[in-house]
Amino acid sequence: MPKQTLERKYEYHRMLPHYQKARRTVFITFCKANRIAFTPEARDAILHRCLHDHTKRYDLHAAVVMPDHVHLLLTPLRDEKGWPYSRPIILKTLKGMSARSVNKLEGSSGPIWQEESFDHVLRSQESFEEKLEYLRQNPVRRGLVRRPEDYKWLWVEQTK
């Protein structure tokens, strides 16, 4: 069976096993541990970390860093052996590196993220467009800005 069609099984901490098909776009949400708003500087650092592995471990289509949570729309890339990077590995790295950055910035230590996260595998272009619009409109719905493009911590991939 070609590697493109293989499924890999991953055990999520405290959750049932998930199967990951190669190159499926996923919508991911993860929240701040205490739900107290991040400072603007912390949001800068988190967005920077989200963009760090874009084109290395995943194609990032969009990201928004809200005051107390993050939404990502991404497609995992393949590692040097041809396997797609797993969502658990992507999230562990992203949450760990962003926590390090925020803790350094704030002179604190320890976890900043809730242990669990939410992910939804997209199955159609329509679903992609719906999730992208949800992500873009999140700052508007929260009353943080009037237009998505006015929100500093929103990044959307430029399509050619």
Locate the predicted segments by residue:
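Short catalytic/metal-binding and nucleic-acid-binding patches
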Residues: 1-160
